[in-house]
UniProtKB/Swiss-Prot annotation:
GO MF annotation, one: RNA polymerase II cis-regulatory region sequence-specific DNA binding
Matches recorded under Gene3D superfamilies: Winged helix-like DNA-binding domain superfamily/Winged helix DNA-binding domain
Listed name of the protein: Forkhead box protein I3-A
Residue ranges, compositional bias (Polar residues): 226-252
Region (Disordered): 201-255
GO BP of this protein: anatomical structure morphogenesis; cell differentiation; epidermal cell differentiation; epidermal cell fate specification; ionocyte differentiation; multicellular organismal-level water homeostasis; regulation of transcription by RNA polymerase II
Tissue specificity statement from the Swiss-Prot or TrEMBL entry: Expressed in ionocyte precursors.
Cellular component terms (Gene Ontology): nucleus
Cellular compartments annotated: Nucleus
Composition bias, Basic and acidic residues: 213-222
Residue range(s) of DNA binding per entry: 116-210
SUPFAM superfamilies the UniProt entry points to: Winged helix' DNA-binding domain
Motif Nuclear localization signal: positions: 206-212
């Protein structure tokens, strides 16, 4: 039976760092002395939890286990109040160099495997067909082109190959060409429709014909009309003659050639490449729908507003950083960045399956 000794009669251990045996069981981990321990107090270089795994009933001591290295905070003595904390060294969290090699920054090649290219599947197909010698490719050749030029698509091939098949069959700008008798093989060829200008929009190919709202915006940007009427009523002889005199070539559409040439400029490191027409037109030459912010009638003008609003606020000259009046101009450089810029992004609405 343990006898109780009053505190006044018990021996005092003043500065030797010697505690009672019962206190030493818990003081190493959870008790911080008020004074700096003397050199006589010996501390283990590292706590080996393997010694306590089979002798104690504490369910938390087996967490690190004998096979794992101790935490860096346990390799030193108890942290005392007011003393600076020690930081993890250059060797890393594991203690030895190379223990956390997976935490190193990825290389450029590894980064390309992680980041998805900012092109839709239809744009990838167009680039593959345009790079072919005869401007036509089979389905397997399109797969091979995408996998060779974009490392991101080397994994999970079943998903993106299915999306490419859907884009080939649903987009009107891709045409299926049967094989000749002199060219035996499996699968048909795919080529680009020469009249795919209506399907081309900001580096992507729409699945079907443009909506009416998009056609109106295109008329305001390009400054001509009558294109939609020619599509809706092809029986009109005047419209058909106008379509016959259109500058669209039988080889490739001008907008498509512009886009694919700019893809080559981006690959060669050119920074002066602009977006396809009508986006290549300077913003100062485009008509901005400023009537939206006026009265209810777009033709009505209010003199008191014209005198109050400065001329520089309604100008459509872009800033140096790429920001312009995107609220007044739907084709501003903020919504459609330059292809040579690092933040190349395209809107993906309706551009892929």
């Amino acid at each position: 039976m343990t006898s109780f000794v009053p505190q006044s009669l018990s021996p005092q251990f003043h500065s030797m760092g010697q505690e009672s045996q019962e206190f030493s069981l818990y003081g190493d981990n959870f008790y911080s002395a008020q004074h700096v321990p003397s050199p006589q107090q010996t501390l283990p270089s590292a706590y080996d939890f393997g010694e306590y795994a089979g002798q104690t009933s504490n369910p938390y001591l087996w967490f690190n286990g004998p096979g794992l290295s101790p935490a860096p905070c346990l390799t030193t003595g108890p942290q005392h109040y007011g003393m600076a904390k020690q930081y993890v060294g250059a060797s890393g969290i594991g203690g030895s160099e190379g223990a956390f090699s997976w935490f190193s920054l990825p290389s450029q090649e590894d980064l390309m495997k992680l980041v998805r290219p900012p092109y839709s599947y239809s744009a990838l197909i167009a680039m593959a067909i345009h790079g072919a010698p005869n401007r036509r490719l089979t389905l397997s050749q399109i797969y091979q082109y995408v996998a060779d030029n974009f490392p991101f698509y080397n994994k999970s091939k079943a998903s993106w190959q299915n999306s490419i098949r859907h884009n080939l069959s649903l987009n009107d700008c891709f045409m299926k060409v049967p094989r000749d008798d002199s060219d035996p093989g499996k699968g048909n060829y795919w080529t680009l429709d020469p009249n795919c200008e209506k399907m081309f929009d900001n580096g992507n190919f729409r699945r079907k014909r443009k909506r009416k709202s998009d056609s109106l915006a295109e008329e305001e940007g390009k400054g001509y009309s009558g294109s939609d009427s020619a599509l809706s009523s092809p029986k009109n002889p005047s419209d058909s003659s106008e379509r016959g005199n259109s500058p669209i070539s039988t080889d490739q559409a001008p907008c498509l050639n512009s886009f694919l040439n700019q893809m080559g400029d981006v690959a060669s490191g050119s920074r002066e490449a602009l977006l396809p027409s009508p986006l290549a037109v300077p913003l100062s030459q485009r008509s901005s729908p400023t009537g939206v912010y006026g009265s209810y009638s777009p033709n009505a003008t209010m003199p008191q507003w014209e005198t109050q609003i400065p001329q520089s606020s309604i100008s459509s000259t872009p800033y140096k950083d790429g920001y312009s009046d995107s609220m007044l101009n739907p084709y501003s450089s903020q919504l459609y960045p330059v292809l040579g810029s690092s933040d190349l992004l395209y809107p993906r609405e309706g551009s892929e399956v």
